Amino acid sequence: MSTRNALLIAASGLAMASAVAFAAESPNLGRAATPEEIAAWDISIGPDGVGLPPGSGTPKQGEAVYAAKCVACHGDKGAGAPNDRLVGGQGTLPGDKPPVKTVGSFWPYATTVFDYVRRAMPYDESKSLTNDEVYAVVAYILNLNGIIADGDTMDAQTLQKVKMPNRDGFVTFSRGK
């Protein structure tokens, strides 16, 4: 064995031994999450609506929430600027031009919109909206896209019944089942 290979093997062994020693001596940082903390983040909503919380909201109520919490990033009536558009784009997915992906043209399930808004919006205060505010702002966005009427109320029962324009625009597959 050459000196170079011997040094390389020795250096590798030393690096591994150091890593093991460091891991054994590292400080105990953090703590285990409590059941309450875990429950607070267990908020996933599936396409079928399982897990939707109590609450409700209308497009009119959502307009006020949108004006206070969303317009700075998504523009007047969801038109975009500086961030993503939320409205329009219907009919742009198939075609020669780049698609305009919005809630009204791309998202397949209204429950997924709820889930995303609830956990990630507003961008600088994620998870800060009440359930009623989330239902309301989702109702407003759906209304702007012509998916629900002005007088509709979104809640755990009605939201899962909304048929999004692109619901059938995705290919489903099974993972070996």
Where on the chain are the PLM-derived regions?
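Bacterial N-terminal signal peptides
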Residues: 9-18
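Sec/Tat signal peptide C-region and signal peptidase I cleavage site
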Residues: 19-23
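Electrostatic cytochrome c docking/interface patches
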Residues: 28-65, 122-125
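Sequence/structural segment immediately N-terminal to covalent heme-attachment motifs in c-type
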Residues: 42, 54-81, 87-88
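Sec-exported extracytoplasmic/periplasmic mature domains
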Residues: 46, 67, 71, 75, ...
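Sequence context surrounding c-type heme c attachment/ligation sites in exported
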Residues: 60-67, 79-80, 107-110, 128-131, ...
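Gly/Gly-Pro-rich "capping" loops immediately C-terminal to redox-active cysteine motifs
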Residues: 63, 79-118, 122
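Flexible coil segments in periplasmic/lumen-exposed cytochrome c-class electron-transfer proteins
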Residues: 124-177
